[in-house]
A protein has these predicted regions:
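Terminal amphipathic alpha-helical/low-complexity segments used for targeting or macromolecular assembly
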Residues: 1-57
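Structural signal for interior beta-strand "rungs" in well-ordered beta-sheet cores
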Residues: 55, 59-155, 159-162
Length: 165
């Protein structure tokens, strides 16, 4: 596993993930800034490139939902921030096969909140709306259905607090 900045100087899986996140940040920039005519063209270009990257990598991250320092470790299915009310904090590490979903699809559009410095293990399912605190580690193949406080380690299906950091 390489550092995300070092990945830009290599080819392969890490380059694709770095390119995905970089394109996502460009899309966020052109979405949020004042729209001049040429900015609309660039936003459309980065949106189409983002859609192509979703099909190519299997990762779906909505613009303006993820804080800085997102670290994607391997390619694989991830669905993060499909709604604008979802927020994933800074310096979050997310492994493959992570799914964010609703407990009940007919309930209102309440959001997720994932705090800063979180580690989300492979195969994790987070059914919300939930609030996950800062510095939380979620073990592999866990199912999170309830709020998690700051500074703890959770695992299991359903996820239970194993220990506090």
């Amino acid at each position: 596993m390489q550092h995300p900045v070092a990945a830009r100087f290599t080819w392969g899986e890490n380059w694709e993930l770095f390119s995905y996140v970089r394109n996502l940040r460009y899309l966020e920039y052109y979405t949020n800034k004042r729209q001049m005519p040429w900015d609309k063209v660039l936003r459309a270009y980065y949106w189409l490139k983002h859609r192509r990257n979703i099909a190519h990598t299997g990762i779906s991250i909505a613009p303006n939902c993820v804080g800085p320092g997102l670290h994607l470790v391997h390619r694989g299915f991830r669905r993060l921030g499909a709604r604008s009310t979802w927020h994933i904090g800074s310096f979050c590490t997310c492994l493959p096969n992570v799914l964010f979903g609703k407990k009940n699809p007919y309930v209102g559009d309440e959001g997720f909140y994932i705090g800063d410095n979180c580690y989300i293990g492979a195969g994790t399912v987070i059914l919300g709306p939930v609030h996950i605190g800062n510095n939380v580690t979620i073990g592999a193949n866990s199912t999170v259905t309830k709020n998690i406080p700051d500074n703890c380690v959770v695992a299991g299906s359903p996820a239970k607090i194993i220990k506090y950091k």
